[in-house]
């Protein structure tokens, strides 16, 4: 591959992602594999786990990746078609601490990509750009590595089933959206003692039923219809590569990740009083309040799973979660985001509570809030506007947080505007105790935004 064939736009903030056959080809992936192998060897790591999700391009791309890693002199262990968290698990289980998942996560079927962990660190930002620089400079190690195959699926299931215990049998609906979690999720929950109804658990990289992204309500319609037929304790939905979990209460309401986090935080803090819990800037104000109420220490941090993971590592916190649905349990687990494990922990805490799951969910704090709202810009344009907003913002009556965009917490609600790291959009989110407060906070943000750029077509 000449470097001219290396499209810079595939090197994203948290991973590598492109359109198969156009910006992401086997030849490109092979070069990236050699760069990852070179970087791993520079850090004294030469054994690398690789795995792939259920996309149609997976077998070709994982083979190219393995060739590239081997060309850098790495010993490659191919664990086959598995959820991304199983790749992370394998880096611990097999002691490699380095692994690459070939996955397009929740992107359309013609996309694929790489999530990369080297020496226990999930690559993001600069570290991902450095792989590109290595290839452009031809700063690549060569060697003759070997490629072997290993199956860690049973070890993964055993590890969870051996630790996460149900107090009573639960009846659950599981929707995998034809993503790669479809093989292991039903097995896991049956082994835990659940009665499982499967929706779209056949792995099919064309995603014929609905898109495997539980962050969007339209992708949860089928599961909601099934669960509200009655007799279910909960519904669980998984994203394309199994690192996020969506939750449906028996009455059909969506339990968004920041409200799920309240339950996980209480559970973890019941065993570790005073523990630290991390969440991202998009999460509800009630999460902060509930963590304090349960005797914990809340820490708000930047959105993005690699940022949250890094913060979790350096802080010694027990649990972290973000609004996108990535949840990281450090207590009893390894601190990586895993939708299947998150589902297992939810089932455990529901089964240990004397109340019916529907009551547990109903008792969670309720607020008036917006989903995530987006405003598109030309590439890079959103960063410039964000800088102007930060310079101009004045909210004397609010607690202002600027670790990731601008978040203003008022006595009765909050507003957030931040620049996305993955697409050229400004992201907004609003929450308040009532509709009047929500409108007031949105008005304040509206006037700030229009003072910076009067022609903005705001989504609120």
Across the structure, where does each feature detected by a protein language model lie?
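An N-terminal, well-structured beta->alpha segment
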Residues: 1-67, 71-72, 98, 149-170
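Short glycine-rich phosphate-binding loop at a beta-alpha junction
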Residues: 45-53, 171-173, 275-281, 318
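N-terminal small/polar loop signature for handling phosphorylated ligands or for N-terminal nucleophile
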Residues: 47-111, 158-159, 187-248
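Proline/glycine-rich low-complexity loops and linkers
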Residues: 86, 129-158, 162, 251-323, ...
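Glycine-rich phosphate-binding loop
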Residues: 96-111, 227-249, 254, 298-338
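Gly/Ser/Thr-enriched, mixed-charge loops and adjacent short helices
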Residues: 112-230
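Gly/Ser/Thr-rich active-site loops/lids in small-molecule metabolic enzymes
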Residues: 124, 198-200, 253-272, 338-348
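Phosphate-binding and adjacent anionic-ligand microenvironments
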Residues: 272-429, 434-460
């Amino acid at each position: 591959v000449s470097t001219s064939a290396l499209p810079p736009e595939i090197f994203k903030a948290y991973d590598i992602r492109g359109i198969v056959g156009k910006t992401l080809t086997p030849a490109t992936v092979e070069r990236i594999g050699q760069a990852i192998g070179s970087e791993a060897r520079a850090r004294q790591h030469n054994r690398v786990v690789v795995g792939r999700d259920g996309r149609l391009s997976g077998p070709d791309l994982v083979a190219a990746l393995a060739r590239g890693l081997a060309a850098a002199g790495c010993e490659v262990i191919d664990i086959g078609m598995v959820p991304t968290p199983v790749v992370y698990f394998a880096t611990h289980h097999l002691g490699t601490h380095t692994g690459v998942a070939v996955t397009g996560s929740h992107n359309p079927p013609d996309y694929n990509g790489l999530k990369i962990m080297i020496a226990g660190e999930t690559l993001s930002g600069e570290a991902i750009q450095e792989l590109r620089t290595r290839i452009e400079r031809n700063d690549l190690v060569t060697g003759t590595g070997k490629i072997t195959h290993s199956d860690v699926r049973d070890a993964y299931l055993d590890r969870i089933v051996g630790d996460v215990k149900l107090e009573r049998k639960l009846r659950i609906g599981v929707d995998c959206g034809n993503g790669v979690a479809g093989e292991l999720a039903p097995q896991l929950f049956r082994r835990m003692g659940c009665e499982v109804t499967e929706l779209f658990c056949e792995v099919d990289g064309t995603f014929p039923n609905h898109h495997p992204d539980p962050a969007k309500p339209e992708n949860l319609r089928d599961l909601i219809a099934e669960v509200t037929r009655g007799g279910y304790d909960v519904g669980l939905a998984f994203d394309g590569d199994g690192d996020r979990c969506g939750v449906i209460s028996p009455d059909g309401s969506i339990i968004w990740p920041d409200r799920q986090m309240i339950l996980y935080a209480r559970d973890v803090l019941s065993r570790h009083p005073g523990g630290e819990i991390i969440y991202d800037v998009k999460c509800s104000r009630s999460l902060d309040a509930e963590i304090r109420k349960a005797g914990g220490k809340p820490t708000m941090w930047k959105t993005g799973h690699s940022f949250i993971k890094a913060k979790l590592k350096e802080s010694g916190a027990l649990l972290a979660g973000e609004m996108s649905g990535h949840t990281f349990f450090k207590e009893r687990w390894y601190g990586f985001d895993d939708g299947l494990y998150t589902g297992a922990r939810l089932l455990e805490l529901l089964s240990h509570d004397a109340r019916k799951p529907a009551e547990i969910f109903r008792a969670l704090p309720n607020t008036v809030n917006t989903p995530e709202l987006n405003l598109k810009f030309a590439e890079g344009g959103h960063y410039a506007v964000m800088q102007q907003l930060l310079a101009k913002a004045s909210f004397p009556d609010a607690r202002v947080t600027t670790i990731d965009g601008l978040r203003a917490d008022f006595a009765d609600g909050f507003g957030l505007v931040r620049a996305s790291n993955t697409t050229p959009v400004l992201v907004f989110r609003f929450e308040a105790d009532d509709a009047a407060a929500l409108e007031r906070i949105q008005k304040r943000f509206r006037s700030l935004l229009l003072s910076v750029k009067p022609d903005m077509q705001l989504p609120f």
